[in-house]
């Protein structure tokens, strides 16, 4: 781990067995500025699959990350994770933030079966993402934002396999609210580059 400088506040909570928080490789860093990281993983069964979070880089500025696996939050301002006692583990998240005023939050829990996967990459500007995936079967998510004033909220829930790959890729303000829920599988792919004055506003619900 190559952590350096400024007002980093790091709190890691891991309850039970088979929880891992890693840096992606030997070149990974957590570099500086007012980064605040709070990670929580809950996996009480020794036979459950391993929960894994890979932080990868995280360079600087006023970033804040709060991510949970096997436990949930009531809203994006909540700082106390509530455990899913039926969770079977196997959640995987990679987080890669490079700079500016980003904030992620979010969690994954599966209520008994079906490991979830979230790959999140946010590289710059005033982005915010409040992402959560819960309930059974594989939800999947691949989110890449890159830059500008995006605000994203994604919920994937209920007992079916959902999938979402969202790119956005910056240019002025962008709002996205995606909800995928149902007992039947949903799928969504969005690639957006918004140049509209005043920003973009998209809301998708599949149920």
Predicted segment positions?
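Low-complexity repeat regions of mature extracellularly deployed or surface/particle-associated proteins
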Residues: 1-207
């Amino acid at each position: 781990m190559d952590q350096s400088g400024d007002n980093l506040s790091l709190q890691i909570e891991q309850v039970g067995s088979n929880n891992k928080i890693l840096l992606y490789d030997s070149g990974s860093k957590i570099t500086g500025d007012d980064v605040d990281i709070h990670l929580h993983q809950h996996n009480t069964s020794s036979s459950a699959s391993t929960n894994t979070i890979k932080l990868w880089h995280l360079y600087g500025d006023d970033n804040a990350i709060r991510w949970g696996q096997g436990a949930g939050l009531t809203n994006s301002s909540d700082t106390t994770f509530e455990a899913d006692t039926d969770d079977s583990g196997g959640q995987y998240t990679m987080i890669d933030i490079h700079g500016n005023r980003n904030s992620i939050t979010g969690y994954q829990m599966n209520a008994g079966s079906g490991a979830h996967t979230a790959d999140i990459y946010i590289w710059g500007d005033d982005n915010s993402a409040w992402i959560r995936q819960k309930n059974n079967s594989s939800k999947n998510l691949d989110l890449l934002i890159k830059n500008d004033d995006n605000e994203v909220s994604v919920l994937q829930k209920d007992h079916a396999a959902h999938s979402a790959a969202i790119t956005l890729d910056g240019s002025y303000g962008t709002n996205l609210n995606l909800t995928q829920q149902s007992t039947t599988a949903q799928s969504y792919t969005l690639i957006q580059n918004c140049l509209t004055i005043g920003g973009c506003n998209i809301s998708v619900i599949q149920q």
